[in-house]
């Protein structure tokens, strides 16, 4: 009985202390984390299918939207047909409404480029480039109208910080891959040193962008995956010397906090690699597909993967918090449901 009374008195004391907590301390604990900049991105969007994700994407109030490639599926040498497919996507009511509120950037992958797994050999690439730029409403006097390839960079200044978006073109200059006839995989790595992913001109441009970057974060958009390289589909790992070249450039350039965004795979995942000599880890955030996905995905090896693969229709969100120097990355789906999330701290 005495034990019960002692316990009851102790309970009341604890409850009393809880009730009289300093409200100022509570406000500090419950202080809402602010987001200074929001990137939404995605890839693999078939213009003939339903586009269910735009309302959910809009709920995240993105500062910008980035197409990671395969904006439409239009493998063709018929430019009139390609133009029709782009217009079909533009006519989608939800997408049209979205673009009136959010700035849109993007690069292409093979299916909007015009040739499945295509590269430098595609004979209609110059014409296809103009249609791609038309879709993005790029001005007729923009430098991209005269250059070879759709690569592009833009700085965003917010709250005394700069975020640089670097859009790579992994199609226009990419040389031949090596078919794998020994396994069930589509491709195997080229002999070391054989081939180029970006071409000499684009490599020099990228070097200049990184060396001269004053950005707190450098967002590099590659239509194909950079870190995941064991699956046998298109990936930077098919040209291992090009992987080394980009990693070495990130180290030598002094560019801060590079994050890679990729698509192509019809799955979404987040990969992370620590690189000797680099002050921060490389993250490759893959977001794919917006209208269709690899729903029968059974698994594949990726030694850099964080969390789980998402094989449902999805999009990617990056929330930048300059106060805490963090970037929170989310894989989301219909109704804004969160499938995976990861927060990286930066200096």
Describe each PLM feature range.
Residues 1-27:
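Bacterial Sec-dependent N-terminal signal peptides
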Residues 1, 27-347:
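Long, structured stretches of catalytic cores involved in phosphate-ester chemistry, encompassing
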